[in-house]
Amino acid sequence: MELVEVLEGKAKILTPKAESIYDAPVFYNPRMALNRDIAVVLLNVLKPRIVLDALSATGIRGIRFALETPAEEIWMNDISEDAYNLMKKNVLLNFKGELEESNGRAVLKSEKTLVVNHDDANRLMAEKHRYFHFIDLDPFGSPMEFLDTALRSVKRKGILGITATDGAPLCGAHPKACMRKYLAVPLRGELCHEVGTRILVGVVARYAAKYDLGIEVILAYYKDHYFRAFIKLKDGARKGDESLENLGYIYFDESTGKFEVERSFLPSKPNAYGPVWLGPLKSQEIVEEMLEISQQLSLARKKQAVKLLKILKDELDVPLFYDTHGLGRRLKIEARKIEEIINELRSLGYRASRTHFSPTGVKTDAPYEVFVNVLSSAK
């Protein structure tokens, strides 16, 4: 296996040389550097002490956590023997000391403790029951096969980071796959990125409730063909009940672009999409702190990270949005400038903002009829 050195953030790692990242014996995707940047920023805000990157491959995420965050004990795990051996090399490339190895587990103790583990992620998380303050699940595809075990491995007031890269099911191109994996009916079309994000958060809420756990969404977003959520667990059956009250369904009229949301454990009408999470997709206070801290860190994609966090900070936190191009096409209305629409909605007393889910979308608490009137009359 021929290796090349790569720099990302403060880390330097060896990765397999290959024509395509998908051909490499150990997976490293440089396009996910921004995903890792946002996780680094969050860990600098929340400061979890013991963290796990459950599906580590080269170890880049865990090594960056060790180098760039206050985390004190960092676990990196992969079922691949090639990945395990490469992670050990990469740890020693970034940290002084010797690895103490036994039974598929290598430990380096210095100012921080780094653990490189060779095992199935579910088996490791089952072994370390209620051990981690933060677990990051970043699989190739869906995280669902790891969710149950992660909810039992993280502390009862811990934090889960979850990435889903299977956009086709969550965006409604493969609805049966979404129903199998996420137990929800997806919505195809211009709203799919937000609906997919809310399906992902919603299934975490349902799984957590089994263990008398509620959830608080620290941040959930869509970027570069992946869905991402950071979720803090809240201990107690009552917290689980409260989280389930934030589940519901979406009704969407394809001919008009009008949508309705319904908070309910079961839908009251046919043709419902969901269940989805209808609660907040961010903690405003934490996102503001993340934006501030991101400007002080040496991130791999700093400009992109700051830009994304600024958009997320300013985004109105209400379910769904109106796509100006989609509505214009349906209603045969000429598309208007988004800032013009937002300003007019605000002048009428409604809240409104851009949304990161779509460059042509507007989030607002204005009714559909008001929005259409503004869309058609804005000058």
UniProtKB/Swiss-Prot annotation:
SUPFAM superfamilies: S-adenosyl-L-methionine-dependent methyltransferases. The keyword DNA damage does not apply. Its EC number is 2.1.1.216. Dimethylates a single guanine residue at position 26 of a number of tRNAs using S-adenosyl-L-methionine as donor of the methyl groups. One of its GO terms (molecular function) is tRNA (guanine(26)-N2)-dimethyltransferase activity. S-adenosyl-L-methionine binds at residues 36, 61, 78, 120-121. NCBIfam families: TRM1. This is tRNA (guanine(26)-N(2))-dimethyltransferase. InterPro entries: SAM-dependent_MTases_sf, Trm1, TRM1_arc_bac, tRNA_met_Trm1_C. Gene3D superfamilies: N2,N2-dimethylguanosine tRNA methyltransferase, C-terminal domain, Vaccinia Virus protein VP39. Disulfide bonds: none annotated. The gene is trm1.
